[in-house]
């Protein structure tokens, strides 16, 4: 082989390792996908879709009921049903997708396919007008499923573009970019919905804002699609048949092989508990703020934006702390803060804006950091060549059990009639997650997976 054919050699024949430069180029491109998809998460899934689709469904309701797949439901319950349906469907679809992604060289193409398909579904919501809530429902379900599929591929790329010792930094920076991008577009869209420029009605402003999130998601996905490298499959289990049959064969082999990675499984269970607690706090915070503490929509909007932008700095800070103390210790510290947050929420005074905003700052600090480090920490515990498969389990199990926290919140409220004990009850998820995480032997898990043990774990 000639020197010029080897990317690790200079033209003069001397050895020049170009891999760090390639990794840096890929990392910069990879960050943009978190920036891209967070617009959908914040503007559509978190803030605007639910009140918009409820309003549309109320027009179509007969005796305050609509028919969803033959089931009579109240319009106010429609967003919850749609999210639940898409979540359960994702839990079944993601594992075979992971096996397919591991066998695919063009992972950036697969990432872009799911992103652009998801953005197309999201754009359908723009056409949900009058009493046609069904097209909005299809848009959200398709968008959510494609978002989960793209997250599997995106997370699986993380171990391919970063070495073990640098993974926490890279993952945290990606999360930070996501919060910044999602926060910027959300601020613009909330201004549009509030100010109503160009004579827009509130409904039209919401439609335009959600369409902008779909366009944002699709447009910024071009950056990773064009600039990420290809990653040829490694350690692929030989299987007969076409790519789909091979993927299912590999998935079956991986399911049998899971028992060989007990440390990764223990962490997964820990993650399911504490992440469910995090997601439930986020999902219920608006309800808690409005129904229990008596805050107006304006205060809730300010708090949502505050959390978004504080989370940008929180994710970066957690990445730096992990470099010094190790991801596991920093995640555990974050869970202690989460327990303090739900405890403080129990005693938060009504209609006192400053304490509520202070709680939002605390949430922002630990929100992005704990999730970003969970992603990078898990990547150390999984074998090379099966990154997408294991991240598909990571996301599928998350979706399959994500109703535990909301069920707990709902049941405690039903029995007590107050949201204060309901929010405090979530402390159990952080405590159980932390106790299980304490049992994770990081060094052993990394060695079992065949990865290099970083100097700081």
Name the predicted role of every residue range.
Residues 171-193, 395-405:
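Glycine-rich segments within core transmembrane alpha-helices of 12-TM secondary carriers
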Residues 43-76, 283-300:
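Short amphipathic helix-loop junctions that connect adjacent transmembrane helices
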Residues 9-28, 229-268, 456-457:
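Juxtamembrane intracellular "pre-TM" segments in multi-pass secondary transporters
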Residues 92-106, 313-327, 413:
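Helix-to-loop junctions at the C-terminal end of transmembrane segments
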Residues 69-75, 192-215, 411-430:
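A membrane-interface helix-boundary motif in multi-pass transporters
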Residues 121, 132-150, 354-369:
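Hydrophobic core of transmembrane alpha-helices in multi-pass small-molecule transporters
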Residues 328-371:
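C-terminal transmembrane helical hairpin of 12-TM major facilitator-type secondary transporters
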Residues 112-131, 336-350:
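C-terminal ends and interior cores of transmembrane alpha-helices
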